[in-house]
A protein has these predicted regions:
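Serine-hydrolase catalytic core
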Residues: 89-156
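Short linear motifs at secondary-structure transitions and domain/linker junctions
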Residues: 23, 117-123, 170-175
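Serine-dependent carboxylesterase/thioesterase catalytic core
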Residues: 2-115, 180
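Generic detector of well-ordered alpha-helical segments enriched in charged/polar residues
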Residues: 61, 82, 109, 120, ...
């Protein structure tokens, strides 16, 4: 993913003639954007992560990976889960106009606690030093921002609410128990934390399910507009 994005960024820079660009990554797009920023820091103005696995990995990934080692049911259960997640990834690719190969098992490994710790050891810029603090606002000349949600069941018409209602059970008993169904509140912290408790689940954060978000919460589109203005006012 990182190398794919790096090539895309280099193409955009070449076509647009821009000196630097702003990167914004959701979910696994967070470490992907951070990787590109580490590779070409002089061409990146800012990195913003939304519901990203940054400070720590996802208990959901940990649980699925640990279940894969169970006797009898482990292998078939993991196969089923990866097929479902691959299908979901393909659906996202379809609605976003991209069609790329999916490897959800590799994604789970990278999103796990061990995978995230290994990634952060190589690419620490913007990661908080404390369990639930903020990271460096500026690192290698790049502005760092993040936001995330702590909603799970936000709209009864949204079919992903059922999935996140189940995945959120993986956070029971965890210190970082507040979550968006996939990522813990503190785990999402990176650079300047704009907010970490929007009443949004993991798909609400990018308005993925055709606007099926909570009617009582901030409109996700408004959050992105505000951030675009924030970057503009910062001269980015």
């Amino acid at each position: 993913r990182g190398e794919q994005l790096l090539r895309q960024v280099e193409d955009i820079l070449a076509v647009s003639g821009s000196a630097r660009i702003n990167l914004l990554g959701h979910s696994q797009g967070a470490p992907t954007a951070r990787y590109v920023a580490a590779m070409i820091p002089n061409r990146i103005a800012s990195v913003t992560t939304v519901g990203g696995v940054n400070k720590a990995g996802s208990p959901v990934a940990d649980l699925i990976l640990s279940a894969s080692g169970l006797p009898v049911i482990g292998a078939p259960a993991t196969s089923l889960i990866t097929k479902v997640v691959n299908g979901f990834g393909s659906f996202i690719g379809l609605v976003s106009g991209e069609s790329l190969n999916q490897d959800s098992y590799a994604a789970l490994q990278s999103l796990s606690s061990a995978g995230t710790a290994a990634f952060n050891a190589n690419y620490p810029a913007g990661i908080p030093a404390t369990a639930c603090g903020e990271g460096a606002y500026v690192a290698n000349g790049i502005r760092n921002y993040s936001w995330s949600g702590t909603g799970v069941l936000t709209n009864p018409l949204d079919p992903t609410d059922v999935m996140f209602g189940l995945t959120s059970l993986a956070f029971i008993g965890k210190t970082d128990w507040q979550n968006d169904g996939m990522v813990g509140r503190c785990a999402s912290h990176f650079g300047k934390v704009i907010r970490d408790d929007y009443f949004m689940n993991h798909t609400d954060e990018v308005n993925l399910m055709f606007g099926l978000v909570s009617i009582f919460a901030t409109d996700p589109k408004a959050v992105y507009r505000q951030h675009a203005n924030r970057l503009k006012l910062a001269g980015l």
